[in-house]
A protein has these predicted regions:
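Bacterial N-terminal signal peptides that target proteins for export
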Residues: 1-7
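C-terminal motif of bacterial Sec signal peptides marking the signal peptidase cleavage site
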Residues: 15-18
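OB-fold and OB-like single-stranded nucleic-acid-recognition modules
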Residues: 20-154
Length: 154
């Protein structure tokens, strides 16, 4: 391969990486605006994160709080079933965003696949906000249900 070909390949890679970063920054700006517009109140925002091999429910945050401040939770369904379980379609709501009613119990729950303890969120109600919400993960594969890594929102 000639030096010119190598230089072109390098510049194309840098250019494409820059485009991806610009797209991510633009998505984050839109997301920040929508979060800032949320009404304060006695509710939570939840993003379902389904993994075939894990038992976590997803990320939960307070209104007007960034997704980077959210917590990955285990859902207590003794009062209300999780939306996908209520529909008898486990995982069908992967990456769906919800307005959640409920509270953190103060307890942690062991999740065996990750060998971690996660906060317990007691669900008392929910409402779908969006089935196709803005991306909160840098990696576009973060919502793949077969993925063995749990990504953290940014």
């Amino acid at each position: 391969m000639s030096r010119v070909s190598l230089a072109i390949a390098f510049l194309a890679t840098v250019f494409l990486a820059g485009c991806v970063e610009d797209q991510w920054a633009a998505q984050q700006a839109v997301l920040a605006q929508s979060i800032a517009a949320e009404q304060p109140g006695d509710y939570f925002i939840g993003r379902r994160l389904y993994r075939r091999n894990f038992f976590v429910w997803g990320y939960v945050r307070k209104p007007q709080q960034s997704w980077s401040q959210s917590q990955l939770v285990m859902l207590n369904e003794q009062k209300v079933l999780a939306p996908d379980r209520a529909a008898n379609a486990i995982g069908s709501d992967n990456n769906t965003e919800y307005r959640l009613k409920g509270y953190f119990s103060g307890q942690t729950v062991y999740e065996p696949a990750s060998n971690h303890f996660y906060p317990e969120f007691v669900l008392t109600g929910y409402q779908v906000i969006s089935g196709n919400p803005p991306n909160i993960f840098r990696d576009p594969n973060a919502t793949d249900p077969n993925r063995l890594v749990i990504d953290k929102p940014e």
